[in-house]
Amino acid sequence: ASAEGGIYKFLSDNLFGLLKADPKCTVFIRAALNCANASIEKVKPAMERLSDIASDKFVVGEENFVESPAGHQLLKKIIIQDKIRHSEGGHTFSKMLLDQLNAKNSLESYIGCNRGAFLLVTIMETGVPSLQQLVKDCLKQYGKALGAQSTRGAELLVQKLNLHK
C-alpha cells in the first residue's frame, strides 16, 4: 500500500507529460485509474487532473486530446468504469469531467466533434441516473448547437437525451 500513494502522486503530477510523451502511456493510465484494488482517495487526484486536461477547450479538427484515438479510448474506458465506481459509493470521473466542462464553458467543443459527442453518449450509457441527469442539465443550453451537428455521435446523443427525458 505504501507504493500506491507514490504511484498515484507521480501520475497526478506527471499526467499531462505522460499523455504528450507517448499515446501508449494511456494503457498504464487507464489501468491505474480503473484499478479495483486502489484506494479511491489515492485515485481521485489523478482523475481530477485528467478531467482538467480533458475539459480544455479545443478547435475541432486541430490536434487535441479528445479527438486523438488514444485520448478518446482512455476517456471512454474510464467513463465506462463509473458504473462500478458509483455502485461502490466512489467519486465518478464523469461528474468531475462534466463539472470541469461546465466551469470552462467547453461543452461546445465536445458537441462539435464526433468523439466528444460519443463520450457524452458513453456517460448516458453508464446507467447512473444522476450522471444521465447531469448530462441533460449541462446540455440544455446547447440544444440548437447539438441539433445542428451531423456527426453520428451527435445523432446518438440526441437520441439518448430524448430516451431519458
Task: Locate each region found by the language model.
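Eukaryotic gene-expression regulator signature that favors modular helical reader/repeat domains
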Residues: 1-165
